[in-house]
C-alpha cells in the first residue's frame, strides 16, 4: 500500500458486548499482520427515546417509555500492509454490527 495510507473503521451496534467483541477481533487481526492500530475510540452513545400511551382511549398519565441505544466505536489502522487488508476482508464479524470502512 502507499505511504501515509490509513484505514478508518466505524462500528455501530445496539449491543455493547457485540461491538466490543468485534472491535477486539479487528484490533487483534490488524496487530497480527504488522499494522499500527489507534483505538478503539468510544464515540458518544446515541439514545433515542419513545413514549407510548398504554391506554387506548383515556388516562393520558399512563405511559410507557422505551429507549434504543446505539453504541459507536472508531478504529484507525495506520500504514496497513497488503496482509492487513486481506485479513480484514476475510474477517467474519457478528450480524448485529454495522461496519463502515473508509480509506484516507
Swiss-Prot record:
Keywords: Ribonucleoprotein, Ribosomal protein
Family according to the record: Belongs to the universal ribosomal protein uS10 family.
InterPro entries recorded: Ribosomal_uS10, Ribosomal_uS10_CS, Ribosomal_uS10_dom, Ribosomal_uS10_dom_sf
Listed name of the protein: Small ribosomal subunit protein uS10
Alphabetized GO MF terms: structural constituent of ribosome; tRNA binding
SMART domains: Ribosomal_S10 (SM01403)
Keyword Ribosomal protein carried by entry: yes
Pfam families assigned: Ribosomal_S10
